[in-house]
Design a protein with these regions (language model features):
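Intrinsic-disorder/low-complexity, polar/charged segments enriched in Ser/Thr/Lys/Arg/Asp/Glu/Gln
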Residues: 2-8, 15, 39, 51, ...
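Glycine-rich portal/gate segments that line the openings of hydrophobic small-molecule binding cavities
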Residues: 40-83
């Protein structure tokens, strides 16, 4: 049986800026990997039907794992839905990630659901990884730095 995590955050910035962080390769390489990992974005065709592919590398051990998928829904500033599948045959199955961006008086309400987490990945580890990633996302999108 696969697992699901749900996360919720409010970020004090616009939905468009947060959405851009989910669809820009350089931004994703900065915020998406949990602490202790680096990321390489190998492919990012950010549109409905487009594909994405990335890998995370454990900075301590140097071990990497790659994953990729397809964008199922792409509504700028509002909603993303995409698949993720690991290259590792020991982690079969397809995960579906749904991200909703809603303008609220204090900025952007962000709701994330990741479903279909392979059995060999503890859901609590996945949840912790997302929390770390969202901390990094907040630090990327919150500052308003003029040109």
């Amino acid at each position: 049986m696969s697992g699901t995590v749900k996360l919720h955050r409010v970020l004090p910035t616009s939905p468009e800026k947060v959405f851009r962080a989910f669809t820009d390769a350089a931004a994703m390489a900065q915020w998406l990997p949990p602490y202790g990992f680096t990321a390489t974005v190998h492919e990012l065709d950010a549109r409905e039907g487009g594909r994405h592919r990335a890998s995370f590398t454990n900075f301590t051990t140097g071990n990497s794992h790659a994953f990729g998928g397809e964008y199922l829904e792409f509504s700028p500033g509002k909603r993303l839905r995409y698949t993720d599948r690991f290259d590792d045959p020991d982690m079969p199955g397809e995960m579906v990630v749904t991200v909703e961006f809603e303008a609220v008086p204090m900025g952007t309400e962000l709701r994330i659901e990741q479903a279909g987490i392979p059995d060999m990945i503890p859901v609590s580890a996945c949840y912790l990884g997302w929390q770390e990633s969202l901390d990094k996302l907040s630090k990327l999108v919150t500052p308003e730095i003029p040109d």
